[in-house]
Amino acid sequence: KTYSDTPVIAMSYTNSFINPSAEHIATKLSECGFNGVLIVDLPASEKSIINSFKDKQLNLVQLIAPTTELSFIEDYIENDPALIYYITQRGITGSNNLNLVEISEKLGEIKKLSNKPVVTGFGIKTVEDVENLKTLTDGIVIGSPIVEKISLDPSLTELKKYVEPIVEAIKA
């Protein structure tokens, strides 16, 4: 926080956030300057865990998948997340099966229920993907391709070549 105003979010599984207790972890994260949590496998019904983080002014990032039913989306939104992260595809991250019709429909459903920002991620890796999604979403997350470029070229030359046209597509 000394050098940047960029929000910092802790991401892990529920088990990591409840041992020794959600209250303890929330306190420690808050003391360290974290702004929020993304708990990948946390059901919306776990109000006590969610409230432990909210009590320490830690924002919730809520994951919603293509298979999430409308009633569960409503439950997630009831938890008042700071941000909704829509998973754009079924399967594993980094695969090639974006269904733009399905993504558009689901994002429309989510935006009817909430005015919170919605970012999309999982499977997004090309300039074409970005061009197709940028008007549908409030933000785009590109993970696996960036991690791959960094691991193959620590000098970051390949990463720069990869990211520059994507940034241009977002700005266009």
Language-model segments: what does each one mean?
Residues 1-42, 136, 161, 168-170:
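Active-site beta->alpha loop and helix N-cap motifs at the rims of alpha/beta catalytic domains
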